């Protein structure tokens, strides 16, 4: 079983990958720069990658994250998570059934689920999720069709669903202070870190801010 308190610490600064944000820069170097500077969990999420490319990136990132003692989560692809022995899987509401994922990965791997409403959060917990990705909190360029989750909804989820959660969606250093009142366990970041010219310095700024 996954220890809830240990998991909360791992969720503090959660980086979701998107190689298109890097504009041609070396994917592995950028990710290692981020990981070595304070990222606590990495989720491999490459929606436009072929299966072969996704697997290649997963195997290499598994090596890097292990070296730094950082948790490694695979988005959607349970098969690849098992092949590369990732720490866990994250699925959305329209992806594979959460209960089926839990059966496939067992009880010793982390299972994260996206949730926008209290109902989705409750279902995710009942179906075997270990943590929630709650959002989109703000408008985001990485998921244009993402519907927002209100602050009131987040507060309800925290109060009524006793499980770790990260906030996701359009979060940056200029608006993060607005989120402190929501008392999440961490923040899932994409563009605010990956678009930075100096990723190491950007991650260091985040570690000081949160």
From Swiss-Prot:
<feature type="binding site">
    <location>
        <position position="95"/>
    </location>
    <ligand>
        <name>Mg(2+)</name>
    </ligand>
</feature>
<dbReference type="InterPro" id="IPR034291">
    <property type="entry name" value="TMP_synthase"/>
</dbReference>
<dbReference type="GO" id="GO:0000287">
    <property type="term" value="F:magnesium ion binding"/>
</dbReference>
<comment type="pathway">
    <text>Cofactor biosynthesis; thiamine diphosphate biosynthesis; thiamine phosphate from 4-amino-2-methyl-5-diphosphomethylpyrimidine and 4-methyl-5-(2-phosphoethyl)-thiazole: step 1/1.</text>
</comment>
<keyword id="KW-0460">Magnesium</keyword>
<feature type="binding site">
    <location>
        <begin position="140"/>
        <end position="142"/>
    </location>
    <ligand>
        <name>2-[(2R,5Z)-2-carboxy-4-methylthiazol-5(2H)-ylidene]ethyl phosphate</name>
    </ligand>
</feature>
<comment type="similarity">
    <text>Belongs to the thiamine-phosphate synthase family.</text>
</comment>
<feature type="binding site">
    <location>
        <begin position="190"/>
        <end position="191"/>
    </location>
    <ligand>
        <name>2-[(2R,5Z)-2-carboxy-4-methylthiazol-5(2H)-ylidene]ethyl phosphate</name>
    </ligand>
</feature>
<dbReference type="GO" id="GO:0009229">
    <property type="term" value="P:thiamine diphosphate biosynthetic process"/>
</dbReference>
<feature type="binding site">
    <location>
        <position position="75"/>
    </location>
    <ligand>
        <name>4-amino-2-methyl-5-(diphosphooxymethyl)pyrimidine</name>
    </ligand>
</feature>
<dbReference type="InterPro" id="IPR022998">
    <property type="entry name" value="ThiamineP_synth_TenI"/>
</dbReference>
<comment type="function">
    <text>Condenses 4-methyl-5-(beta-hydroxyethyl)thiazole monophosphate (THZ-P) and 2-methyl-4-amino-5-hydroxymethyl pyrimidine pyrophosphate (HMP-PP) to form thiamine monophosphate (TMP).</text>
</comment>
<feature type="binding site">
    <location>
        <position position="170"/>
    </location>
    <ligand>
        <name>2-[(2R,5Z)-2-carboxy-4-methylthiazol-5(2H)-ylidene]ethyl phosphate</name>
    </ligand>
</feature>
<dbReference type="GO" id="GO:0004789">
    <property type="term" value="F:thiamine-phosphate diphosphorylase activity"/>
</dbReference>
<dbReference type="InterPro" id="IPR013785">
    <property type="entry name" value="Aldolase_TIM"/>
</dbReference>
<protein>
    <recommendedName>
        <fullName>Thiamine-phosphate synthase</fullName>
        <ecNumber>2.5.1.3</ecNumber>
    </recommendedName>
</protein>
<feature type="binding site">
    <location>
        <position position="114"/>
    </location>
    <ligand>
        <name>4-amino-2-methyl-5-(diphosphooxymethyl)pyrimidine</name>
    </ligand>
</feature>
<dbReference type="GO" id="GO:0005737">
    <property type="term" value="C:cytoplasm"/>
</dbReference>
<feature type="binding site">
    <location>
        <position position="143"/>
    </location>
    <ligand>
        <name>4-amino-2-methyl-5-(diphosphooxymethyl)pyrimidine</name>
    </ligand>
</feature>
<dbReference type="InterPro" id="IPR036206">
    <property type="entry name" value="ThiamineP_synth_sf"/>
</dbReference>
<feature type="binding site">
    <location>
        <position position="76"/>
    </location>
    <ligand>
        <name>Mg(2+)</name>
    </ligand>
</feature>
<keyword id="KW-0479">Metal-binding</keyword>
<keyword id="KW-0784">Thiamine biosynthesis</keyword>
<dbReference type="Pfam" id="PF02581">
    <property type="entry name" value="TMP-TENI"/>
</dbReference>
<keyword id="KW-0808">Transferase</keyword>
<feature type="binding site">
    <location>
        <begin position="43"/>
        <end position="47"/>
    </location>
    <ligand>
        <name>4-amino-2-methyl-5-(diphosphooxymethyl)pyrimidine</name>
    </ligand>
</feature>
<dbReference type="GO" id="GO:0009228">
    <property type="term" value="P:thiamine biosynthetic process"/>
</dbReference>
């Amino acid at each position: 079983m996954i220890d809830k308190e240990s998991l909360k610490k791992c969720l503090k600064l959660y980086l979701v990958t998107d190689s298109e944000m890097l504009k041609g820069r070396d994917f592995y170097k950028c990710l290692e720069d981020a990981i070595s500077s304070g990222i606590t969990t990495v989720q491999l999420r490459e929606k436009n990658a072929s299966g072969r490319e996704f697997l290649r990136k997963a195997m290499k990132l598994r090596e890097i994250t292990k070296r730094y003692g950082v948790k490694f989560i695979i988005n959607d692809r349970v098969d690849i998570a098992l092949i590369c022995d990732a720490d866990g899987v994250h699925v959305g509401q329209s992806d594979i059934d959460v209960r089926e994922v839990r059966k496939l990965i067992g009880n010793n791997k982390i299972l994260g689920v996206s949730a926008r409403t209290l109902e989705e959060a409750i279902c995710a917990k009942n179906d075997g999720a270990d943590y929630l990705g709650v959002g989109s909190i703000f408008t985001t360029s990485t998921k244009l069709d993402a519907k927002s989750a209100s602050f009131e909804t987040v507060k309800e989820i925290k109060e009524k669903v006793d499980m770790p959660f990260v906030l996701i969606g359009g979060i940056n250093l200029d608006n993060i202070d607005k989120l402190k009142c929501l008392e999440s366990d961490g923040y899932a970041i994409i563009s605010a870190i990956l678009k930075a010219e100096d990723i190491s310095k950007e991650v260091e700024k985040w570690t000081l801010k949160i």
